[in-house]
Amino acid sequence: MRNFKFKRSLTLVAASSLLSLTVVSIPTAAQANPVCTTANFVTTCVGATTDTAPYSMMVPANFNGTVYLYSHGYRPNVPVPAGIPGYGGYTVTNTPQPGPNATVIGALLAKGYGVVGSGFARQGWNADSAIKTNVELVGIFKKQFTKTTKVVTWGESLGGFITQALAEKHPDLFSAAAPLCMASDITPLMTMAGDALWGIKTFFDPTIKGGNYSAGAAGYAEAMGDLVKVFTVIGSLQAAFAANPSTPAWPATSKVPDAIKAIPSRSALVLVALMAGIPMQSAHFDSTSAPPGLPASNALSFQLAINPAFAALENVANAAALAVLATHDLELQAGGAVFDNTATDYSARVADEQFAWSSALSGVSGTQGLLSVLAASPRAKANPAAVEKMKALASHSGKVEIPTILFTGVADPVTTAGNQQSVVDKYATYWAEKWATAKKAGERKRPANNQLVLWNLTPEKYTKYTAAGAPDTSVPAATGTNHCNFTTSQYMAIADLLAYAADNGKNMSGGALLTKLRKAGNMTYDRGYSAPKMKYYGN
């Protein structure tokens, strides 16, 4: 098998997906009234809600009465020291963000729409407080701009979670909602993150603490140390994969038995991805293609065994890094360890996938060998009181009475497509219950379907190769991959769909919808498509 070299180092998306757009200066305390300035026919107002969360409002001179309330994604609640890949140099910020990016904000203002967004009073997992902040912010906006007639809400990642919760809990405030690349309920999400982090610890570096962090400064140091160790493992695997993709060596920090080390380390990483429910397509690896010019047997081996391992490498790196930060954050809030896999059967977790990915897992014997390590390794045990406290945090019922538009990439490695699918399934159950109740009451008209589900699919093949035949990770991430990896055209299509829903009381449908999606590019409406469930919900 030919040896391959990456054109450049592994691309990480986590930091860029989490850090937010800087739009305005940040108020330091709650202000009774917004402070406004007008320039270039746009009035910009800043202030802070009663919880001290800073906000920004922008309204054009030709304001048409509709405002877009945007909720930003997860921002770490602690600073990250410089030098740590992906997040290094991050400082905690509550800068308000009234839209996905400056281009989208400008386009909405040009169309006569207002935009508003909060920086929130607390960073990290802040859904409960953010919901209250946004409700107050809507009232402030309406008081300041009395011509407001409709409010639509949208957001990404954790902001998508917040958006869905607003639609469920406050349908009286909003005309339509669009949760994008949404996070799911926290327990399923932390199960995925915990499985990924525990898998890396178990196979590659048992000194990773992986949770149950100490209180105070000691716990912060442990979490930052884990980040360093995770990226050290990823760097070691990356070098090994590039040097010998067929049988890459194990990291020096691994303590698995020598007999297990006879199995390629790439197979262990693939197993980590599968057992956590992390996608097997990544920003640059489609899990199906091979470099041009390889002999047929080598090409088949690359397609079935090597490409999937590179995909797992990119995706697990992003999932595990966020897992460290989110675990530390949630443990601080809940008062103890929240991840528990004492009863998890990882063999059952991959019962279906192990055959589809047999070559990547080094066959039946390789799979069984790796699973034996998981079965014999010490498990993580949660603090019951902390788990109950975490369960009390905001969650989704799936019950919405206003038009709602869902959109996510099918190979998002952070908020996997299963996050969106869980809300789709909950709404389907709710709608069926409503229809059954209506029929029992003698009604013949079906309830309105208030949920429009859209998917950002990946191309069939998209891995690029250099002239030397090496995988090229310098090209942009493929559509449908990475975290919240959307184009301006896609954002504007969602914005247009929200405006239509707000004006008409229902989602766009039929030919008009399909034309809108086609023009935006890489947006799919397919009622027959169902994303894999998150592992928390079973296979």
Residue ranges and their predicted role:
Residues 7, 30-31:
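Targeting/processing segments of secretory and organellar proteins
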Residues 1-2, 21, 402:
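A general, composition-driven signal for non-globular sequence regions
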Residues 2-14:
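Bacterial N-terminal signal peptides that target proteins for export
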Residues 1, 31-32:
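Initiator methionine at the very start of the polypeptide chain
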Residues 12, 16-19, 393, 408:
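Preference for short coil/turn "hinge" residues that link or interrupt alpha-helices
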Residues 19-29:
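C-terminal segment of classical bacterial N-terminal signal peptides
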Residues 33-153, 161-539:
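C-terminal His-loop and adjacent cap/lid subdomain of alpha/beta-hydrolase
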